[in-house]
Amino acid sequence: MIRTPRISILVTGVLTDSSIAFHVAKIAQQEGAQVVLTGFGRMSLVERIAQRLPDPPPVLELDVTDTGQLDSLAGRVSAHTSRLHGVVHGVAFAPQSALGGNFLNTRWEDVATAVQVSAYSLKALAIAALPLMGSGGAIVGLDFDASVAWPAYDWMGVAKAGLESCARYLARDLGPRGIRVNLVAAGPLRTMAAKSIPGFAEFEGLWPDRAPLGWDITDPQPAARACVALLSDWFPATTGEIVHADGGVHAVGG
């Protein structure tokens, strides 16, 4: 058991109780951590979902493309905790035109949106949280393997490659402050975000058969547990890493 007593964690990206971020928050609370959530757009939905956690946490609004909200984040979080020991980046988005086999025809404006929300926001969130992190802590982002070109994933795959590179540079620059930056690359899960990806059914059908350990597309717990482990002090010398929680598919290829 990994205990995380007396630590405070900011979790972004919770939309439904099927999301990895929700289960990160749930497991972290079960292990003793204090949690603060952020939501965007559908705040009433996020607030309702927060009530399903063991200890319903505060929910703050955060649009990662809004510099005003980012600049005020530390102040708003400080109303609930004076220190952040961990941050979970669970934010990703790409316009429909950037997915589903339209790679060659996607406009730059839509590509820019995917990259800003899904990759650059890791750096933006880290900078926003730094005033409360002091010396030491962990930032963990949610990833999907960007080492190959997946069917239909298109510009979101490019954005995830950017996320992976961004995490390495953050690990370099935040390491002197004792802050670890890692990613968890999960296998496909039947979340609200995944359902919006054209061609997602291809992942659903193939992944369980290809995974040496098997894979349950309805169970976010393996990925969430990996996140909580990285948020804890059990990985004090690990940074700039991508931990694959995908049943082993990344290791065996097609």
Q: Which residues does each PLM region occupy?
A:
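Canonical Rossmann dinucleotide-binding motif of NAD(H)/NADP(H)-dependent dehydrogenases/reductases
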Residues: I2-L37
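Active-site loop of short-chain dehydrogenase/reductase
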Residues: R6-S8, S82-H85, L130-D145, P176-I179, ...
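Catalytic loop of short-chain dehydrogenase/reductase
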Residues: G13-V24, F93-I127, S135-P176, P188-R190
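A glycine/serine/threonine-rich, flexible loop-to-helix segment
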Residues: Q51, P176, P188-P212, V252-G254
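Conserved mid-core segment of classical short-chain dehydrogenase/reductases
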Residues: L60-D71, G75-S78, G86-A112, P131, ...
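N-terminal Rossmann-like NAD(P) cofactor-binding module of classical short-chain dehydrogenase/reductase
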Residues: V88, A92, V140, H244
